C-alpha cells in the first residue's frame, strides 16, 4: 500500500479507537459495592447518593411532562448523542478529516498533469477527430 493510504487508514482508526475506549461498559454496581466494602467505605453513603439521584430523575421527569413533545424529542436525541459519543471521538474525527483533506489536496498539487497520447484517447474522441478531418477542419 502507498504511504498516503496507510496514513489515511491510521487517521480514520483514531476516532474509532477513542469511541471504543470511552464507551466501554462501566463495572457493574454489584462489583463497585464489593470494592467499596473491601476498601472500608460505608455502604450508607452510596444509598444516600442513590436516593438523591432518584429524586433528581423524578424532578426531571415531572418537569418534562409540561414541555411540548418536540422539545422532549430533541432533548432525548441530544442526551443520547452526548452519552453515546465521547467528545474526544468527535474532535478526532474533525482533525482526521482536515488532515486527510490537506493530504489529498497536497497530493494533487504534486502530481504533474498527464499528457494523453493518441492511443489513449477514447473512441468517441477519435471519431470526432476523423469527422474534423473529413470536413476540412
From Swiss-Prot:
It is a single-pass type I membrane protein. Residues 24-84 are extracellular. Residues 1-23 form the signal peptide. The chain crosses the membrane at residues 85-105. Residues 106-137 are cytoplasmic. Keywords: Cell membrane, Membrane, Signal, Transmembrane, Transmembrane helix. It is found in: Cell membrane. It comes from the Eukaryota. The keyword Signal applies. The keyword Metal-binding does not apply. GO terms for cellular component: plasma membrane. This is Small integral membrane protein 9.
Amino acid at each position: 500500500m502507498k504511504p498516503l493510504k496507510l496514513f489515511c487508514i491510521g487517521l480514520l482508526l483514531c476516532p474509532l479507537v477513542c469511541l471504543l475506549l470511552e464507551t466501554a461498559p462501566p463495572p457493574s454496581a454489584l462489583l463497585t459495592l464489593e470494592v467499596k466494602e473491601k476498601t472500608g467505605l460505608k455502604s450508607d453513603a452510596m444509598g444516600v447518593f442513590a436516593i438523591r439521584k432518584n429524586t433528581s430523575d423524578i424532578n426531571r421527569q415531572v418537569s418534562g411532562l409540561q414541555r411540548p413533545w418536540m422539545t422532549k424529542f430533541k432533548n432525548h436525541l441530544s442526551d443520547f448523542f452526548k452519552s453515546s459519543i465521547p467528545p474526544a471521538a468527535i474532535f478526532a474525527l474533525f482533525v482526521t478529516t482536515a488532515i486527510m483533506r490537506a493530504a489529498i489536496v497536497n497530493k494533487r498539487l504534486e502530481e504533474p498533469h498527464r499528457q494523453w497520447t493518441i492511443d489513449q484517447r477514447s473512441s468517441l474522441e477519435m471519431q470526432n477527430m476523423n469527422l474534423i478531418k473529413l470536413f476540412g477542419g
